[in-house]
Amino acid sequence: MAATVYRPATAPIADAPCEGLVCLELEDGSAYQGYSFGAPKSIAGELVFQTGMVGYPESVTDPSYRGQILVITFPLVGNYGVPSRETVDDLLKDLPAHFESNQIHIAGLVTASYAGEDFSHFLATSSLGTWLKEQGIPAMYGVDTRALTKRIREKGSMLGRMLLQKEDLAVSAPSLGVPGDWKPHFETIEWVNPNEKNLVAEVSIKEPKLYKPDEATALKHPSGRNLRILCLDVGMKYNQLRCFIKRGVEVLVCPWDYDFSKEEYDGLFISNGPGDPKVMDTTVEHISAALQKNNTPIFGICLGHQLLARAAGAKTVKLKFGNRGHNIPCTSMVTGKCHITSQNHGYAVDATTLPTGWQELFINANDGSNEGIMHVDRPHFSVQFHPESTPGPRDTEFLFDVFIQTVAKCTTDNTLLQKGVEFPGGTTEENERLHPRVDVKKVLVLGSGGLSIGQAGEFDYSGSQAIKALKEEGIYTVLINPNIATIQTSKGLADKVYFLPVNAEFVRKVIKYEQPDAIYCTFGGQTALSVGIQLKDEFEALGVKVLGTPIDTIITTEDRELFARSMESIGEKCAKSASASSVEEALNAVKDIGYPVIVRAAYALGGLGSGFANNEAELVDLCNKALAASPQVLVERSMKGWKEIEYEVVRDAQDNCITVCNMENFDPLGIHTGDSIVVAPSQTLSDEDYNMLRTTAVNVIRHLGVVGECNIQYALNPFSREYCIIEVNARLSRSSALASKATGYPLAFIAAKLGLGIPLKEIKNTVTKVTCACFEPSLDYVVVKMPRWDLKKFTRVSTQLGSSMKSVGEVMSIGRTFEEAIQKAIRAIDFHNLGFSESKGALMSVDDELQTPSDQRLFAIANAMHAGYTVDRIWELTKIDKWFLSKLKGLSNFAKDMTKLTANDVVGRPDLLLRAKQLGFCDRQLANFWDSNELAIRRMRLEAGITPFVKQIDTVAAEFPAFTNYLYLTYNASEHDVSFEDRGVMVLGSGVYRIGSSVEFDWCSVRAIRTLRESGFKTIMVNYNPETVSTDYDEADKLYFENINLETVLDVYQMEDATGVLGAMGGQTPNNIALPLLRAGVRVLGTSPEMIDTAENRYKFSRMLDRIGVDQPTWKELTSFDEAKAFCQKVSYPVLVRPSYVLSGAAMNTVYSEADLESYLQQAADVSPEHPVVITKYIENAKEIEMDAVAKDGKVVGHFISEHVENAGVHSGDATLILPPQDLEQTTIQRIEEATRKIGAALNVTGPFNIQFIAKDNDIKVIECNVRASRSFPFVSKVMGVDLIEMATKAIMGLPFVEYPAIDRPSGGVGVKVPQFSFSRLSGADPVLGVEMASTGEVASFGVDKYEAYLKALMSTGFKVPKKNILLSIGSYKDKKEMLPSVAKLSQMGYKLFATAGTADFLQEHDIPVQFLEVLAKEDDQKSEYSLTQHLANNMIDLYINLPSNNRYRRPANYISKGYQTRRMAVDYQIPLVTNVKNAKILVEAIARYRDMEIGERDYQTSHTPLQLSGQVNFTLQDSLSRPHSFKKAHVLSVEQYTRADLHLLFTVAEEMRLSVQRGNVMDILKGRMLATLFYEPSTRTSASFEAAMKRLGGEVISIATQHSSVQKGETLQDTLRTLACYADAIVLRHPDETCVDVAKKYSPVPVVNAGNGSREHPTQAFLDLFTVREELGTVQGLTFTFVGDLRYGRPVHSLVYLLRHYSGVKVQLVSPKGLELPTDVRQQLVKAGQLLCESETLTPEILGKTDVLYCTRVQKERFPSEAEYEKVKGSYRIDNQTLKHAKSKMAIMHPLPRNEEIAEEVDFDQRAAYFRQMRYGLYCRMALLALVMSG
């Protein structure tokens, strides 16, 4: 078998000269090609891999690597360059400061990618490549190092040789490598096995040399001389020397074979080194002699450890592939503690051969191999790992102290030479006795409540993990969490779930009721922590133990002062700050802090009065302003522009401590980490930076006493090693969810176990199943987290980013390069983003946007780069590390180059396409660059064999085999990690959490996956949101952490050969790609995407409702202000207005008058044919009702109805829902059920769907229908105890299930769902409810009635029941009247009422005592007792009911009403605010009834049982066919016979036909009928289409072949027709003579259908063309049709032009060659109808830009007077991707087919190409026509 050759796996560095290829050949013959970046030469050696993520300068200078080719598993190498070779070490005087020896020892270096000259670090003086060249060491990048590591892991260490490309043999496309027989292109050299040489002799010092410590710190011998360590240098790393010298001993370094028996010394140290200890006999003899004498303590490291063991008489063995990494756990046999160590060795001591008197000191916690030995009664010990680290963690450096202390003691007391070494940290037995396991049977877990900004889905994930862990330990778990939308609160997780507020009052009640043994407060975010702090002193009395981190620790971390003091006590520093109440105090404070400082006004919200001061003048100015707003200012050291770095730290009760993941913020300090782009692991920290912060993290966490998991954030000065601790979160946080997903290490699961006292080393790594959980993951990929903001949803919100978090969700992406990962992340944020490219959006000026970051920052960087800004200029403005900026600049430059090419240029350049994919560009983006379309690029890519590879996330960088199904796609690789035999069902997740689509869709996805798995299906989850349970790797059989877009889903679907794609559970994200997936040949499970489109296209949906007789509010799409005005007058105000292209209430507004309409339309959009608006009649005071249902094949099999508390007009996502409904009349309910059944049948739904109705006086109307799971599914499923998603999944998969199952809840009782808002985080946003959704989450509670449930649910959102003062401000008279009884009730209950002017007058008239308050002018406002703002500011108001008069359309931002001002103040001062009259009424009633609430078993009830329905008959079709109409038994000869109503009937029946065909129904409408087809001209399509149509309707066909018939004998047409009429019920005729239709009309006794009369007409083609336009674009009205080609003889065009006169607003453009123009009479029709827009002989970009329907016809040679005339125009109308770049993104390309050259094949892959679908629509249309003509 030929050995495998792999082409380079990554793109070459841009803008750098190519240094040639290198081929890495292995002993087994496989060859990996890559790019050279070191010395241009070939070498051979032993191939080894190292899994550390930092520290390449230290590693390559480590003498232990002598002769080895080093493979670094972390893919990004060279990022922080190389420090100066000249700088000498302060301690070692003549040795270099930054390296482990004075030369590079590796033979060669192999990496996946390389940073080139774009390195970034304040100490760097050159790139890695430059240094390697200086030292003559070859290096290569572009190798799939993961694949290579797996090969070494499986086969063991092997020999390799790096062969340089021959200079004279250039390769045309280096990125494709040299395929096939590569050897002639590369040099060749002999194999070398370094282990056969004495490598130690090469690296050891040549003669003894003495190093002395600083006299001030020197340790002395009793005789007065310095304490001396003799070091045997068998390949010593300089840091071992540094560790000794800085501890005050002098070191005599001796060569490896030196006989040191004559030397005077106090301790013997044997260093690390390379090679096999077997060849070192001389050294072993010298050590043996020292052991015999036992004059001094002895300590060995690495090779020194192996030599000591051999000298003692033990044996050593060669390991399969060695241990080389920075994360290897070693357990001490003395203390039982587990330490994370740095290692680099290929041999080990065989512990079974240790002689008497010796025992194991450390063992490897992963594989049990020996890691250290000690003598029982002599001071001799050694370790296999590197306690001096560099690179790696410094956790075991204390062993140097142990050794030196032992040496010092032995010099004063030589009896100690007869004793073993003493180690700190107690014994294993003592430690286990001090920290026993916690014995608990029942644990209470506090959840986090509703999702809000700053506290979102990550707690669903971490809470679910914690419960899984507790269940695994057999503990009964009780959860309090009112968040009904999450998996955490589902059946099957916790044993009991309380849907109650997570606050002290209710938690106390639950504890008394449940009597748990223990409680967890660390899995519910800030909410749960606060409760823990409030109840801290009561827990003991309640008999509850706090698990995990102690509450006192939490209090320390939450309180700035306490925290700063605590840090000071261990010598760590926080940001310096001081408070001042005058300018003088501030100036004094600064002396200690130093400039620059940040000044903030204390007690001011939203960062009021804060700013930066760089000098005294600025400080004075700022303080004056701030002190005007507040009595005190805080002055704090400004670290703006510093790097922000985070570590996730885990610690168990026995003090084992690890850091699981470190993260670097792309944005510098100053932006909240939740609003920052975050990269894991850090990219620009050197080993010293990384481990300095890691060591600090471990020290801080140990000092604080955290048990479980926590997060520590630092600010790091990029120009020094100065750092500050910003904060510690002693709980699971957003970062922990991210870290878990980024590394595959299940933090929350582990933390829950640690809280039970289980030590880390006893918990298994669930991914590898063989290693333990006490280790630090090594990553061989890079992860980018990016926030998603939804600031457009709010009025008047500030878009600036700062220290307060504003994002509502986040995405995470994984790649093998930063470019690949960040481009994926940008696309994941929003469907419209294609990647890192300039955006045409309305940004502020680029400089402003870069300096004051907003949610548009990344696009501003792209625009700046596009405009030619340099990396340095952008860095000055943003302070984003230059390494990141250089990477982005590379993308920007590549994109610029690509736009110069077209698809045709790229066809022969697979290397370009490959490079683009390796840089993370998506097909859509490339299609944009190259004027093509996504599917054409895809096809080109597949033909070039360019597809992504699937890689695993395994926590160990491939060092151990992993059983992980956690996967991502990358183009930077050369092989897959997995095989594809499952053929699973793909479930598409919800994508990023945003307003309108949040955790409820994750619940749906997970429930679907669990149902599929329980039913025996293999499952594949696709999602990219790190906060979710669905991206937990144990939920599905395979998890692809990938984007949900057409390209990625197709890639996964085709690789996995999946059985189908289930998209109905993930909300709108999967729905958006359902139709394109279907068209690309994917089996989409559930309702047909064409039906989804029918429900989502307002024209199609509206027509469908009319067809089935379901009412809807009147609406119209309008293209001018006058039309809009006229429509509004007709339907009367108020109306809803919105731009036509948006869904889900984006930019919608309610308009109450013509003046409002005018200003809204000016502000929102210029109304024009390009930008139409949709206006809908707004029905005031109507109830809104939510229907959630499941259907199978169009029959409803389960449903629940919930009612909204608020009237229609509040977005359903912001509404309060009640289930079962309390105020609906039976008739309303029945009408809703009836309408639902009709809609389900018409859309042929299989699976979940949701309909929103409005009802007024029992009249119901449909607002919208979502053919997918909706936001309310978890709520109704949990309240009713019937899992609708499980039912829907079974219906979709054809599994058995029970229709309308029994409802599982006790009788009586109501569930109420209440929205959770986050206005307090969004400074400036107006907290009113409207048609735009604004809530970020939801909660629900249960009660005896709706009032109790509502109050509990409202309290769950943080609402506090008012104690005494209530302020009222009610706008409209109607609301005042409606509120009166409620206000009276408040007064009776003893509340003190305050009100604004109008409200106060009204209440006083009705004898309700009230105090008047007013918003006064600035100067009076401060002191007046009537000041409303002062009452709010001083927290004198407990509840503010502010009911604005009609929520007018959004006013421009500068208009600030008093109402807005006070509403905003209420939010800022955290005063409960109610802005809706219905909410106010139910709230008052609830407060009146339920002053204090008891908890207990809640009784549930349903007020009605759904009726069991018998099979439903579809009457509409029968009705349509039996009604009198103009098709019945009539000829169909010309389009001129038909009206718009006739067309409407034909198309309605065609839609029914389509449903029928899709359901696979056998129809017998025309059973027993016969159709004859008579074609005098050749035809395959039309005849086949009629034949298929007839047969599908149950009829038969006789086709007459005219060329063999009696026609040849001279029979006339009329005779043929009369004869056929004797056999058939109808005839389809095509004839070259235009007058044939007159003959037919005159002589045929049965209906004749014209299939083309010469070049005159082709009516059925025109019908199907119109039907196609309706189906593709929703409507025909208002469209612009462009007809191209032969318009003179193109009969379908003539018919179509005639029919278009029936549709208003249609415009026509004609493009044809001279001589083939539209016939004059047809053209006249267009002119008369006012539809002719333009005529041209060429298809110009302007014409295309206006086109909605591009209709192409054949230009045939025979139509031209001469060959020359034909040749002139032949190619001028060819439609290809190049032409289409000028076309609209939503349009249709049509062609009656067959085609010649008119449309290029590449266009077939464009979503807009409708011509093959046109054929299918034709079938439905002709079925409808035949049925109408022939039935009955």
Swiss-Prot record:
Free-text note regarding domains: The DHOase domain is defective. The third step of the de novo pyrimidine pathway, dihydroorotase (DHOase) is encoded by the pyr-6 gene which is both physically and genetically independent of the pyr-3 gene.
UniProt: Mg(2+) 3 binding residues: Q1252, E1264
ATP-grasp domain location: 564-756, 1102-1293
Region (CPSase B): 984-1484
Residues annotated as the enzyme's active site: C302 (nucleophile), H386 (for gatase activity), E388 (for gatase activity)
Organism field: Neurospora crassa (strain ATCC 24698 / 74-OR23-1A / CBS 708.71 / DSM 1257 / FGSC 987)
pH dependency: Optimum pH is 7.5.
Residues noted as binding ATP 2 in the record, renumbered to the chain: R1138, K1177, I1179, E1184, G1209, V1210, H1211, S1212, Q1252, E1264
GO cellular-component term (any): cytoplasm
Additional remark text: GATase (glutamine amidotransferase) and CPSase (carbamoyl phosphate synthase) form together the glutamine-dependent CPSase (CPSase P) (EC 6.3.5.5).
InterPro entries in alphabetical order: Asp/Orn_carbamoyltranf_P-bd, Asp/Orn_carbamoylTrfase, Asp/Orn_carbamoylTrfase_sf, Asp_carbamoyltransf, Asp_carbamoyltransf_Asp/Orn-bd, ATP-grasp, ATP_grasp_subdomain_1, CarbamoylP_synth_lsu
Regulation of its function: Both CPSase and ATCase activities are feedback inhibited by the end product UTP.
GO biological process: 'de novo' pyrimidine nucleobase biosynthetic process; 'de novo' UMP biosynthetic process; glutamine metabolic process
Residues annotated as binding Mn(2+) 4: E1264, N1266
UniProt similarity note: In the N-terminal section; belongs to the CarA family. In the central section; belongs to the CarB family.
Residues that bind Mg(2+) 2: E727, N729
Positions of the UniProt region annotated as Linker: 401-442, 1485-1528
Region (CPSase A) residue spans: 443-983
Residues binding Mn(2+) 2, per UniProt: E727, N729
Cofactor needs: Mg(2+); Mn(2+)
Protein's name according to its UniProt entry: Multifunctional protein pyr-3
Binding site for ATP 1: R560, R600, G606, G607, R637, M639, E644, G670, I671, H672, Q713, E727
Induction notes from the record: Repressed by pyrimidines.
Catalyses which reaction(s): hydrogencarbonate + L-glutamine + 2 ATP + H2O = carbamoyl phosphate + L-glutamate + 2 ADP + phosphate + 2 H(+); L-glutamine + H2O = L-glutamate + NH4(+); hydrogencarbonate + NH4(+) + 2 ATP = carbamoyl phosphate + 2 ADP + phosphate + 2 H(+); carbamoyl phosphate + L-aspartate = N-carbamoyl-L-aspartate + phosphate + H(+)
Annotated residues for binding of L-glutamine: S64, G273, G275, L303, Q306, N344, G346, Y347
Binding site for L-aspartate: K1609, R1691, R1754
Region (CPSase (Carbamoyl phosphate synthase)): 443-1484
